[in-house]
A protein has these predicted regions:
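N-terminal, polar/charged subdomain of small-to-medium soluble alpha/beta proteins
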Residues: 20-146
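Intrinsic disorder/low-complexity segments
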Residues: 16-18
Length: 146
């Protein structure tokens, strides 16, 4: 029949293994990591670029399929440890001036590696602004259609 069905028109939905799931990050199935600490050479100011700085990263990764919820099979989901490893590798290997650019780069890498429909990331950089505990950026990246 027609896709999407009339009852779902205007909603962000897609088919995954015969199950209709939402692709809206607020409601779709995802895995997440909170407080992943990585080291990265990042910053605009010269004093920030002499040594790697600690960053705290929260990331949510949209699942390309809901199969794992029924199968209990590790192969049907996204591996938390693999996501953490990818973030650590990219944070160490790349040099960015802006947290915004780093957020985009990490999201793109995660979407590409894990076929995720979307990634939401927050990167926190402590102790940069006097009087503020930390600064940071949050970013939502959707995989290109197609």
């Amino acid at each position: 029949g027609a896709w999407p069905p009339p009852a779902l028109e205007g909603m962000h939905v897609h088919r995954a293994g015969g199950v209709i799931i939402s692709s809206m990050p607020e409601t779709s199935p995802h895995i997440f990591l909170q407080g992943l600490v990585v080291e990265s050479l990042i910053g605009v100011y010269p004093q920030e670029r002499h040594a790697p700085q600690p960053l705290s990263i929260d990331v949510a990764v949209g699942l390309p399929s809901t199969a794992a919820f029924l199968s209990d099979n590790f192969q049907d989901t996204v591996d938390y440890a693999a996501v953490a490893d990818l973030i650590r590798q990219e944070a160490a290997a790349q040099r960015f001036q802006l947290l915004e650019r780093m957020a985009h780069h990490l999201c793109q890498a995660i979407v590409t590696r894990f076929q995720a429909p979307w990634v939401r990331i927050s990167i926190v950089k402590p102790g940069i602004v006097p009087g503020a505990q930390a600064v940071g950026v949050s970013y939502l990246f959707r995989a290109p259609a197609g």
